[in-house]
Regions:
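Structural loop-to-beta junction motif characteristic of Rossmann-like glycosyltransferase folds
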Residues: 137-139
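Small/aliphatic-rich secondary-structure junction motif
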Residues: 2-57, 135
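Short, hinge-like loop/turn segments at secondary-structure boundaries
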Residues: 56-60, 106-108
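A short acidic, glycine-rich active-site loop
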Residues: 58-70
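Structural beta-alpha unit
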Residues: 1-7, 20, 34, 77-110, ...
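Generic structural signal for helix capping and beta-alpha/helix-loop junctions
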Residues: 48-49, 99, 121
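Glycine-rich, Arg-bearing micro-motifs that act as flexible, cationic patches
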Residues: 109-134, 145
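General small-molecule cofactor/ligand-binding pocket signal
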Residues: 40-42, 88-92, 141-143
Length: 147
């Protein structure tokens, strides 16, 4: 039997710019503040898929830079509200589910937002939350804002 890993205080938060993910980020920041933890805030991006003929992509199009700006805009008010919390924004290319699961190694908690629609699991917690809850290497909290 192996001994459990010592807590790191690291809370991984998956955000996509949606109101639900921003509420989850705020919740995670409060939790980090209460526990002396830190936040790793992750936003992913992908090239849009195409079928058949694809429209030309402008040479100056930089989806990673767009995502980075969105992430910075999400993190800024949270950092202002919780200045004592270390927040590391991260951008990664790819689907969010496997990236969040991989990054959950060594984290104490993974927090994602809920879509909050319907009664079925996939509709209540969303596909990313459902995937992470099943595969993450740490506990997962799917945050659903009060309505």
């Amino acid at each position: 039997m192996t001994a459990p890993e010592a807590p790191t205080g690291r809370i991984l938060v998956g955000v996509d710019g949606s109101p639900a993910s921003l509420h989850a980020l705020s919740w995670a920041a409060r939790q980090a503040e209460l526990t002396g933890g830190s936040l790793e805030v992750l936003m992913t991006w992908q090239w849009p898929g195409t079928y058949g003929w694809a429209a030309p992509i402008p040479a100056d199009y930089d989806p990673e830079a767009d995502v980075r700006r969105t992430l910075e805009a999400a993190v800024e008010p949270v950092h202002a509200a919780h200045p004592g919390v270390t927040i590391r924004p991260e951008v990664a290319e790819g689907r969010p589910e496997p990236i969040l699961v991989e990054r959950s190694k060594g984290a104490d908690l993974l927090v994602v937002g809920s879509r909050g629609h319907g009664e079925f699991v996939g509709m209540v917690i969303g596909s990313v939350g459902e995937y992470c809850a099943a595969h993450a290497h740490c506990p997962v909290l799917v945050h659903r804002p009060k309505t």
